[in-house]
Amino acid sequence: MSNNMDLGYEMFCYQCEQTANGKGCTKLGVCGKTAEVANLQDLLIFQIKGISCYGKALLAQGKEIDKSVIRFIENVLFTTLTNVNFDAAVHVELLKESQEIKDTLKGMTGEIDNHTAHVTYTLPETKTEMLKDAPMAGIMYEDLDPDIRSLRQTVLYLSLIHI
């Protein structure tokens, strides 16, 4: 499975009109985003995918998702997809909160019939360890057809319309 680092990139971001040569930023964002923040953002999106898997299972069990979880997901999407916050410390705190939420939802649902990395991943304690794990969460983390990968990114970015 290839990822951003396998491709020799410190980061990979192509979500805005400022991307380098219209192809994506791979060392430092034209917008000022650092590789550190880009990788923490990738891991945050990865985590909310796991939260969403548990949320889906919770709904299937006829239970409700607490509004604070919805607000958290909205906040993460806004923070990561609109490039409004390049503070690594804030992203680390959001990541820690994401793991707490995921653990809480897991406790509410029990084991679910989804064993993807988004669900099974447990966030490490330190930023250094988080950054070591971040490549698996990068945009290029899955060995997918480029069209499918692009469609997934489009759906992710379109989620902001509903916030």
Q: What is each stretch, according to the model?
A:
Residues 161-163:
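Conserved small/polar residues in nucleotide/adenosyl-binding loops
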Residues 42-86:
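Long, charge-rich boundary regions
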Residues 146, 156-157:
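Extended, charged alpha-helical coiled-coil/arm scaffolds that mediate oligomerization and mechanical coupling
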